[in-house]
């Protein structure tokens, strides 16, 4: 897999990243967490609010150099999700927007299971191929189909596949994981770039209320949300 050095650039993307991390903290358990695909550690330090032991794993040494400068309470390690080996097991393993990038998502999930304590949890979050935004894009003729991967998604973001809630659950079951929870996060009516401009114009207080409203609105509409999550044991 070619690793693309991409970080969240606009303010809306950063809001989304924080919401995803908060969701992982809500669903996680125990005292230790492994954050796979941590990148430059933009959001990994948030886990210190809940977990005593926080470890970040990423394939990019350039990202990890940046992450290590920001917080010395977190151990950052280099490794690929499908093949990493650690002499440690964790109460919670979190993968935020990662499964759509890797060569073999089932192998990654199986490897995570080997690093999970008994009774621990694996948390997976991915973009939703069936989101309202993508379905509108199909109707507008911008996207060929909900499962179509655009050149930008493939070449810039490094996406290799799309997920619906059904296909995400199926990959978890193929990895012999028990799915104990699932849902959606963030009803998103417009693309990130446009929402980013709107939020910037309205200011942080408005954006905070807007994001909370999008999360609340999406709670009963998981299939329509921008992101999907599953909780596995």
Segments from the language model and where they lie:
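A generic structural signal for alpha->beta connector loops
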Residues: 51, 73, 119, 176-179
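S-adenosyl-L-methionine-dependent methyltransferase catalytic module, highlighting the catalytic core
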Residues: 103-111, 121-231
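Flexible loop residues that form catalytic
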Residues: 41, 98, 185-187
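Basic phosphate/pyrophosphate-binding loop/patch that engages nucleotide-derived ligands
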Residues: 114
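Conserved N-terminal segment of class I S-adenosyl-L-methionine
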Residues: 1-88, 92-94, 109, 224-228
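A short SAM/SAH-binding and catalytic strip from SAM-dependent methyltransferases
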Residues: 92-103
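Generic enzyme active-site microenvironment
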Residues: 33, 56, 98, 123-126
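Active-site micro-motifs of SAM-dependent methyltransferase domains
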Residues: 83, 100, 131
